[in-house]
């Protein structure tokens, strides 16, 4: 009887508990969360998922507002709050400190920092309550139960079963596993009905060509991860395209997720959930399918670095379904944690001033196993053998890798930066990497030692004979020297004048070698070096003590000896404010020297590339001056002069920072292999026009191309190629500038330059002109006359075509 009396009481208790549990499903108005303490998250009914504050990488000073798998030890994040940045199609993860608060009040959800400033809200009102569902979806609902906002509708990098991505939504990979910023890859359900995987430039967010697409333009509808674990793309006609094809594991036994990972692969994962599954499976996430199957082979982009960073290569482990980025030997990562930034050589780049013998002594080609950079070729030879292939790369300062294909006897040369690198087991070729030789090579030491022993006895004998006879010979030498000096001084200048084709247009002064040797103090103070020789500072013994710059022409090709004075005559006929003036010359036997006016402010290279930015107005003045100087050389001289080696080192600045072009008119005097290539290339790495690498005629447009590079350097106050920059996408200025221009983010190029930001319209105009100059097709580039007009603002500048293809032409 007594138990019957307790039955009504038991029923009441059960009813109370049921209603109490039901009430916990709803998160009511007035509820709040804080990063620290026990009240830091709202849990789903089964406790599978949680919404709230999660410490970033175990760091108790920084917290994400996120949704995560609550029963998994590492608290795998599946959603995190973001806010829009000022960059196109970019968002920034919300990270807050202790003292912040998330509160559901006044019909809205709001996150405020310790100072009370709102840092995030989902931008909905009239919220009646919230729910953390067992599907992993966090919802805000109205008092009528209608969904106002849900985390499934604002995905991050992951989707879960029952989640649907409609047209116009996207998944963004993280930059790193512990860096929740937008990464280098996107999965877009485009408005046009196409499902596309993109490689995205960082930080400009410029979209490169897709590396995978469903090809369903006009037919696609939505991406579905259904409740059974299948992922498919539905079409408007009701049919489906399977995105993953893995066998579906029980939803009751396993947690499921699909994530666009940091390496650009969209993977479906499972994790043992039930006791039975945990007894059979290791408690960790296991990838059961992936798209694309092998991203190392899939991404082959004309612009950008590929799956990994520049100068690195991608490897794929099919058994673990993982990728890895590695550096070739003698290269190292810019940042060991952020390997996407690529690799750089751990040795000094080869100088283009080395002759063939020096290059062969200092560098060698070493084989590397099955690694290929398929889109970095700039030269091809066939038929050829491997030995010659090696030699041609070693003596070419542009060449970093050679690939020899034995079946076809073909050699391909590649240059930095290397892109789209991957480990290719099917590659039927020998890949050779150029590296410095070891300076203490045993073979070199032993050969040198044996040679010394062999020649030692002959050296002693020869020295004895020489010194024994020197007393007698010295008397004769003194007499001959005095007499010869007298004759030489009286006839030297007459000899030089007799060699001239015509005296008209020559510089006003003809110097003897002795005069210039004395003026330069024995060629003591070096001002600079270039392809044509070394420049020394000197001072004339005139009333004013005029400072001069003396260039000693070196490595003059034999057939050009007679052309020297003709070229001096041509240069002597040039008179322009923006050209360095030739004061005189010396032509004594093999000694060829040019005497120029001295430029007190040195080269543009020194002026531009230092810790402080030169004033914007001075940079504009230099750009306009250089353009006028080139226009004069190309179109106003009696005989057109193509410079062929335009670079900041060949632009000098006078007392008033007026830009003056130097080294013009010397191009055809130099040996065609001066840059150590067999293609007749002249110029300097980073400034060379694409046509130098092709068997086509060279025109004045090669100077226009080089000017485009210089113009970007003037705008940004940095070199075209900088291997030490923090972001890999900024390594090559011409690529980065093109990305920024296409995205409408020119301000990124001059972010730390207040003067340039104030003149952002002119900056944009200069960048547009530069991109016109950088067109791969020479006929597409403007003349220097047109360039002058565009820089001055005298004509409208149409939008330049995207010069993406010039990746194959830059060094």
From Swiss-Prot:
Residues 1-23 form the signal peptide. Disulfide bonds join 296-314, 308-325, 327-343, 389-411, 393-399. The chain crosses the membrane at residues 465-485. The keyword Mitochondrion does not apply. It holds the Pfam family Pkinase. ATP binds at residues 527-535, 551. The keyword S-adenosyl-L-methionine does not apply. Residues 486-811 are cytoplasmic. It is found in: Membrane. Residues 292-344 form the EGF-like domain. Residues 24-153 form the Bulb-type lectin domain. One of its GO terms (biological process) is response to other organism. Glycans are attached at residues 26, 39, 59, 219, 226, 237, 242, 321. Gene3D superfamilies: 2.90.10.30, Bulb-type lectin domain, Phosphorylase Kinase, domain 1, Transferase(Phosphotransferase) domain 1. Its main location: membrane. CDD domains: PAN_AP_plant. Keywords: ATP-binding, Disulfide bond, EGF-like domain, Glycoprotein, Kinase, Lectin, Membrane, Nucleotide-binding, Plant defense, Receptor, Serine/threonine-protein kinase, Signal, Transferase, Transmembrane, Transmembrane helix. Residues 521-795 form the Protein kinase domain. Residues 352-436 form the PAN domain. It catalyses: L-seryl-[protein] + ATP = O-phospho-L-seryl-[protein] + ADP + H(+); L-threonyl-[protein] + ATP = O-phospho-L-threonyl-[protein] + ADP + H(+). It comes from the Eukaryota. It is a single-pass type I membrane protein. This is G-type lectin S-receptor-like serine/threonine-protein kinase LECRK2. It comes from Oryza sativa subsp. japonica (Rice). The lineage of its organism: Eukaryota, Viridiplantae, Streptophyta, Embryophyta, Tracheophyta.
